[in-house]
Amino acid sequence: MRTLALAAGLCACAAHAQEVPPPAYQLAAQRAGVPSTVLYAVALQESGIRRNGRIVPWPWSLNVAGQSHRFATRADACAGLQQAMRSTQHTRIDAGLGQINLGYHQQRYASPCDLLDPYRNLAIAAEILKEQHTTGEDWLLAIGRYHRPAGGEPAARYRRSVSRHLARVQGTRPTAAALVAHQEKSP
């Protein structure tokens, strides 16, 4: 019985263990002044794929007019991005770990394929998160505005989705009360 109780306790602890964001996320977050767990949770939402039984952000991800595309290499992703740009309005194309929008953030990169550099993409995503955050407010509100600066229901849906990733990374559970409170605070 004692062994069973110990095993159950270990399983419960493992289910809520904190996941440390990889060093690249920590560095980009530190430079921008945002929590690394927030940046990592956003990347999980934006470009996450299942690999070896875990969800991980994928650097060579594109979203073109609502359709997700994953590539094996940066070169393949760049070719896919260039092809998409010939036929799709740039405001309908997102690229990289943080799914940076080509049209709305064109001032942040020199060449569209720069967004497929994981370090550059994370730096831009962290900058956007920082710009959307107001001192003293919950980071979930900034997360919603990262997705949709105008707020509203699309931002609230995005917040709810990212909050699940954030809770996993932080080793906590998202509570219904917290999600409702975040929803009520949003414009």
Where are these regions (language model features)?
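N-terminal signal peptide c-region/cleavage motif recognized by signal peptidases
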Residues: A12-A14
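Catalytic glycan-binding domains that act on GlcNAc-containing polysaccharides
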Residues: Q18-T175, P187
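Acidic, Ser/Thr-rich low-complexity intrinsically disordered segments
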Residues: A181-P187
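Sec-dependent signal peptide recognition
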Residues: M1-A7
